[in-house]
Amino acid sequence: MATSRLPPATLTLKQFMRRQQVLLLYRRILQAIRQVPNDSDRKYLKDWAREEFKRNKSATEEDTIRMMITQGNMQLKELEKTLALARS
């Protein structure tokens, strides 16, 4: 009998799409952090982002995840604004 190659906890389409949103947000945050001129600030922000995403990794509630993505996007926009002001 052939066994399935899928892991026992395969993601639904909705979960898969939400996961992609989270990963994209994480990548965008790390890209923005790379533009921080000060090495210690850059390391602090990178560690902060990593810990925040790790801390919320086990979240499964759809509304909670959506809210965290929204908050993450707002924080990313704030970081990008701050970096733009620092460059000008």
Curated annotation (Swiss-Prot):
<dbReference type="GO" id="GO:0032981">
    <property type="term" value="P:mitochondrial respiratory chain complex I assembly"/>
</dbReference>
<dbReference type="Pfam" id="PF05347">
    <property type="entry name" value="Complex1_LYR"/>
</dbReference>
<comment type="similarity">
    <text>Belongs to the complex I LYR family.</text>
</comment>
<feature type="transit peptide" description="Mitochondrion">
    <location>
        <begin position="1"/>
        <end position="19"/>
    </location>
</feature>
<dbReference type="GO" id="GO:0005739">
    <property type="term" value="C:mitochondrion"/>
</dbReference>
<dbReference type="InterPro" id="IPR045293">
    <property type="entry name" value="Complex1_LYR_LYRM2"/>
</dbReference>
<comment type="function">
    <text>Involved in efficient integration of the N-module into mitochondrial respiratory chain complex I.</text>
</comment>
<protein>
    <recommendedName>
        <fullName>LYR motif-containing protein 2</fullName>
    </recommendedName>
</protein>
<dbReference type="InterPro" id="IPR008011">
    <property type="entry name" value="Complex1_LYR_dom"/>
</dbReference>
<keyword id="KW-0809">Transit peptide</keyword>
<keyword id="KW-0496">Mitochondrion</keyword>
